[in-house]
């Protein structure tokens, strides 16, 4: 089982797709999700087009290390962050987005990769942004997908989406699978697929059911604050992809990200929610390949399809 180790002893399970001779593309998954949430066919399309695709489980998810027993009071973290006391919020959180960004570096180091293109989705986009800010020299480019800047006024979920996101996961397998349909709230209105969501939930449950980890990941996001200043100073080719149907992180989160990063390209995708439906893979893959194949970011706004 391939794993990467951090200096603090965290073990990160990873998988690769494609040829190591191709430009490396690290995919960073989001809140409460395992690497299998990256559709295999999506990754294979990228690999078949000449990218060395790397996927991994964030800490506290999947087959990576779990911080068992590291209790966190998410309400206290939220209160501290909401009051502007990020120092207190970080004291209460077991780790932050910076630590999760360091985990990305550990994966690259394990593979002997000096620099990589990095694509992050949702919380993974936040991690990728943090990584780009703190370790710009390790990135070839950044793709921030369905994510936001950490500024509280942007990318705010609808009440219904937030309630569904924070609902406790049922411990019984069948109930857990049935609850996956709540994800239709933020999925593509045109391509939302309950059966697909339930199939992923079944695979995720059987691979690793670990609801304890989501509280610590939530605390990491809350305690990390705004990345606006770092994004303003970022000198890195950046593509921002956001679905116009997204109710979990609405499009203004992506628009704000692109506004802050100098030279960033913004791609607003019709019929895409907080998901990556298969009918949209070709346009998403084409945009990612185009972006990771150029040396300079070209200011532009795309609307697809």
Where are the language model's segments positioned?
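Catalytic active-site module of serine/aspartate enzymes centered on a nucleophile-bearing elbow/loop
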Residues: 264-305
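Acidic catalytic loop of the alpha/beta-hydrolase fold
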Residues: 245-249
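Flexible "cap/lid" loop of the alpha/beta hydrolase fold
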Residues: 133, 142-171
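Conserved HGGG/HGGXW glycine-rich cap/lid loop of the alpha/beta-hydrolase fold
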Residues: 8-87
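Active-site nucleophile elbow and catalytic-triad environment of alpha/beta-hydrolase enzymes
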Residues: 214-230
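Short beta-strand/loop motif that positions the catalytic acidic residue
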Residues: 234, 240-242
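Conserved alpha/beta-hydrolase catalytic His-Asp/Glu region
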Residues: 175-216
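Conserved acidic catalytic loop of the alpha/beta-hydrolase fold
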Residues: 94, 98-116
């Amino acid at each position: 089982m391939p794993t990467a180790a951090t200096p603090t002893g965290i073990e990160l399970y990873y998988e690769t797709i494609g040829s190591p001779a191709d430009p490396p593309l690290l995919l960073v998954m989001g809140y409460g999700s395992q690497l299998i949430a990256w559709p295999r066919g999506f990754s294979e399309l990228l690999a078949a087009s000449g990218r060395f695709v790397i996927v991994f489980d964030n800490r506290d998810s999947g087959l990576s290390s779990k911080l068992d027993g590291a209790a966190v009071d998410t309400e206290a973290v939220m209160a501290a962050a909401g009051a502007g006391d990020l120092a207190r919020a970080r004291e209460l959180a077991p780790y932050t987005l910076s630590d999760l960004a360091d985990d990305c570096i550990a994966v690259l180091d394990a593979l002997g990769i000096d620099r990589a293109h990095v694509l992050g989705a949702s919380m993974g986009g936040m991690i990728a942004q943090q990584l780009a800010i703190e370790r710009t020299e390790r990135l070839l480019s950044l793709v921030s997908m369905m994510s936001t800047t950490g500024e509280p006024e942007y990318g705010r979920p609808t009440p219904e989406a937030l309630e569904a996101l924070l609902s406790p996961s049922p411990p019984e397998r069948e109930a857990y699978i049935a609850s996956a349909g709540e994800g239709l709230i933020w999925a593509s209105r045109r391509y939302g697929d309950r059966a697909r969501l339930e199939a992923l939930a079944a695979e995720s449950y059987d691979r690793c059911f670990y609801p304890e980890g989501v509280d610590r990941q939530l605390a990491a996001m809350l305690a990390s604050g705004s990345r606006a200043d770092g994004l303003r100073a970022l000198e890195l080719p950046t593509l921002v992809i956001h679905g116009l149907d997204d109710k979990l992180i609405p499009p203004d989160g992506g628009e704000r990200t692109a506004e802050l990063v100098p030279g960033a390209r913004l791609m607003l995708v019709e019929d895409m929610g907080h998901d990556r439906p298969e009918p949209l893979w070709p346009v998403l893959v084409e945009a990612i390949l185009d972006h990771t194949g150029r040396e300079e970011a070209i200011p532009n706004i795309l609307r697809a399809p």
